[in-house]
């Protein structure tokens, strides 16, 4: 028998691609492997929080307007005129031997010198606060860099700014872990895992202490005015303590600027997270039914203080947050509730005795 004829093949038309199946191949897992599965981490951050963070960054950038330049130029011209007039008065008083006027000129020079010195000091501290944001950006770049140029010097500068002595155990472990073949990303990563947690742990303890004090003070104090003054004073002290831990010396204007940055950051980016975390805890545990109104207000004040401390910690920290390193309100919430319940139980048991 003759073989059947084959169909015609037309090479003028393009080749047709065979459709591929969208299904993945079957995978079989053993019973032992099934116990090692972990649920996928779901990012609970709302979608609009990224937009809020961008709005914060745009709001915190200094705006160099024409009016500001004109005001600064006018102040510089006025200062030069005052100095020139003072020099002229001093020369005239010396030539005429007017010792009273000469003493007044000397006193004025001392006052002006003290004012200029304080302005320069405030400017330097404010500049250091602004430089911390640039250092954080530089650290973020180094954590993605494969060069071997600036990593070690950058980390040593951070340790010196934070007041960490060369004989500190954490710094000694970091020196022992690094070697010449490591790149900047590995060196800065080792610093972030070995040295930076020492400062972060101290900052967390300060936040816990100040938040607990705010909670207990609001819970037991009957005067709202005293509560407001106490909370404002303790929050400023908390910001100063955190800035000092991270090697930033705050002046008057730099303290106001940091406080403003923290409040702006909370207002833009922290409202949704605060409402979500506090609301979930209060609704799930029904704290309003268990605790008194003053106790609930104390917990709210303590959580706001903790939120303030977390944001101050984020702005003063020289390194960006790594995975799961950023403190959350939940870390402090359970501690505050436990301390408040313990205090209330002690106060109830003391009259019975």
From Swiss-Prot:
| Membrane topology listed for this record | Multi-pass membrane protein
TM segment ranges: 70-90, 100-120, 213-233
Spans of biased composition, class Basic and acidic residues? 1-19
Q: What GO CC annotations are associated with the protein?
A: plasma membrane
Per the UniProt topology annotation, the Periplasmic ranges are: 1-69, 121-212
InterPro entries on file: DUF697, UPF0283
Location of the protein in the cell: Cell inner membrane
User: Where does this chain mainly localize?
Assistant: membrane
What family does the database annotate?
Belongs to the UPF0283 family.
HAMAP family linked to this entry: UPF0283
PANTHER family referenced in this protein's UniProt entry, alphabetically: UPF0283 MEMBRANE PROTEIN YCJF
Q: What is this protein called in UniProt?
A: UPF0283 membrane protein YcjF
